[in-house]
């Protein structure tokens, strides 16, 4: 928690005054992926209270998968848009997370299959929940597949453009050769 606070503060201090055309606020949005490391709401709220104190809370456009998958609790009172990722394996899982108050769903057309991703996207759309694509460290050709899906999704609230998480270049030594 303390490391997360300090990292958020360091990033916020570096970019808080930079303006961009891609958000409605003109500010750089923060996309935090906790990968299930917050064991409960109280602990997560300590991070978000800190974010509010330093002026960073309003910049958090997504807080992805803050809790372990088995932690099923109403999150509608959390002052940031929580995104389900690893906990939304299926359309049934996505419905459950939406009912718990999650405000976005990560689609993974490569990992969750295209057909399941489209089912999840349809359900989320019907319930007014935005989706975005995440790449699960896929290779360059598969990133293009995700771009194809992402291009058909509405922008996340507060954004003027779509969002696609892509981190394969950080995990493949020969990324440039694979292009």
Where are these regions (language model features)?
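Catalytic core of soluble alpha/beta enzymes
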Residues: 1-137, 141-143
């Amino acid at each position: 928690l303390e490391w997360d606070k300090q990292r958020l503060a360091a990033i916020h201090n570096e970019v808080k005054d930079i303006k961009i055309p891609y958000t409605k606020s003109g500010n750089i949005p923060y996309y935090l992926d906790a990968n299930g490391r917050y064991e409960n709401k109280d602990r997560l709220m300590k991070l978000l209270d800190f974010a509010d104190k330093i002026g960073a809370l309003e910049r958090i456009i997504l807080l992805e998968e803050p809790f372990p998958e088995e932690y099923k609790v109403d999150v509608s009172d959390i002052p940031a848009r929580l995104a389900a990722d690893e906990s939304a394996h299926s359309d049934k899982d996505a419905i459950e997370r939406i009912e718990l108050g999650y405000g976005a769903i990560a689609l993974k057309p490569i990992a969750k299959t295209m057909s399941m991703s489209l089912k999840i996207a349809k359900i989320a759309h019907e319930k007014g929940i935005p989706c975005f694509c995440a790449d699960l460290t896929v290779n360059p050709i598969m990133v293009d597949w995700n771009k194809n899906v992402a291009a058909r999704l509405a922008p996340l609230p507060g954004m003027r453009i779509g969002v696609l998480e892509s981190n394969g270049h950080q995990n493949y030594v020969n990324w440039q050769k694979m292009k």
